[in-house]
């Protein structure tokens, strides 16, 4: 990749040449020289003439020998004029809109007529249809000059001359993450905050932001997205196994629990394999049937010694990344992909087909991408429907098979995939490609010449690096600080942070639920059935299965608050994001029935205080439960083959007034000992056996909800001062007074425990004031609703 591309993400810091030469000598040496007549700032000659500093020793680099003469282009470049370089912050983004024919205008048969094969090309010479010939000539010449420089020289010169160099990887594991932050900012955060053409969000309130990161090890793009969105996003990673795999343990700026790696049906992460592409699509659709909101691709490989034909060598990689994106994206989805030179008819034809599959495209060069390389990014916005893009997907599949069949392409190659003459008829597209290539090419020539100048003249220095760093980080929404590993704080200190103003008085943490043992206890506690909700809870066979508070301190470090008021490590492995504290229960979920039944531990979340650092304690009860559900869906990986963690899900929530339908949906399951128990079916062919229900009120003691007949709206009524507020007109300062916080809901929770199998039978009853039967509870609810 031209002057190593952006898989330059972890580079050694170059050694500095000593400038303050005086410090290189001991005080004794300087004193001896002064005794012999030496004076500061005067030469050593008889008349104080001569050099004022020592001759610097030869800086030997690598295997370079004495007497080497660098190319005249480089030598002349030793003089650098800063006016040659134009900095644009922010960078302009020029969108190309596609108002013309749609993707479904092309069938597979029609597109096959565009295919051109011929003798394999191993040079870009003559590829001037889509750029100014002079620019291509200067780019290729400028790159060739660097063959005379070794890696250390190039690296040192690049570090000194690039105005954006000191941004480096910021708080992330590599520079790719910073590039994604830069691109997201350039494009008005269209990836982490996607909106439709009318400006409305494309992510529903209870929906996760789904994304895919392809050919992306070690994962910088994903680290940025998770830094920005945390667990409100869920990512799918696809890359080659091996040395360039994802390094999730190196995610310091974000937690990787919401990231799910998948390597295809072949288990190798090879994106050239059609079966891998299709299995990735199937895996994603199991989680989100519509597809992902956006896809990112950052593929590249070493082209050492063949930098000038990187585009030709990367053609199948381009195609497969584009093709996979079309398969996995939902309608209105977006795509960003790293590409290099776009001079050949093959590459331009690929971009044209993507242009037809989306409403808008842009080719951008972010400032975080070094100016001297040919790297750029294709950004595609608002994907058209799968039905519209089906013909192009089938065509790209066919071309990929041809490229993969080495026997067919031993000497020949696919040279064009869309007729160049027909493409040229789309004047807007043609002009866009030419202008883009020329603009990026001019900047690249300037960048290459600047590196050559700085390599030749060690006195040159870029003075804007500090100023540019601060401005860019601010614009991209990144902190100006160094990367550091997350701190593993002591339990009490972390609790102080997460509980905040609830930390001083913690007695409520150990408050038990109030048990309902008869209709009298229901009458004493439940004023308005409409304000109450319930979740089914497990049987609590042991203390470990009791409903408890859970605290995740760090990755793999989940604690449970015991009845002894101590935090103990949970032995079962669950993948929970650090800085989380919530109320939940470890239950056994079952798969199958009878003697073949299998059971596995699962963690069910009931309510939350803080989820992955997001404070939800004072949000209304239903909103907290909805966020707990999103949190669990983001972290859970139900379809992984190598499941090393227990399942994570939120408890199913029901309105108390819907208890009848809750029981109607339960059925009897046969357990391993041939006993039959009422079980609750989960959404993945599993079930669990409840041992009771736990109830929560969404309002504080002073309020009840009611329905206004005159306005047809819900309102909240204060039973003490008789004030009332419609749901959509609640003052901000009243919300905390009306809606129960986590602490209030937790402290006032009720428990109906099923200690007798007859309690949950539909018609069973008994005149026992200490046992609450289902029939009595259902009648209580009906009576309450009848009186409201």
From Swiss-Prot:
Major subcellular location class: nucleus
Residue span(s) of domain G-patch: 25-71
EC number: 2.1.1.57
Binding site for substrate: 143-147, 158, 308-310, 373
Catalytic activity: a 5'-end (N(7)-methyl 5'-triphosphoguanosine)-ribonucleoside in mRNA + S-adenosyl-L-methionine = a 5'-end (N(7)-methyl 5'-triphosphoguanosine)-(2'-O-methyl-ribonucleoside) in mRNA + S-adenosyl-L-homocysteine + H(+)
A Pfam match: FtsJ
GO cellular component: cytoplasm; nucleus
Compartments reported by the entry: Nucleus; Cytoplasm
Annotated ranges, domain RrmJ-type SAM-dependent 2'-O-MTase: 171-384
InterPro entries for this protein: G_patch_dom, mRNA_Cap_2O-Ribose_MeTrfase, RNA_MeTrfase_FtsJ_dom, RrmJ-type_MeTrfase, SAM-dependent_MTases_sf
Enzyme class name: transferase
Signal peptide: none
Catalytic residue positions: 179, 298, 338 (proton acceptor)
Subunit structure: Interacts (via C-terminus) with r2d2 (via C-terminus).
Protein name (record): Cap-specific mRNA (nucleoside-2'-O-)-methyltransferase 1
Organism: Drosophila melanogaster
The encoding gene: Cmtr1
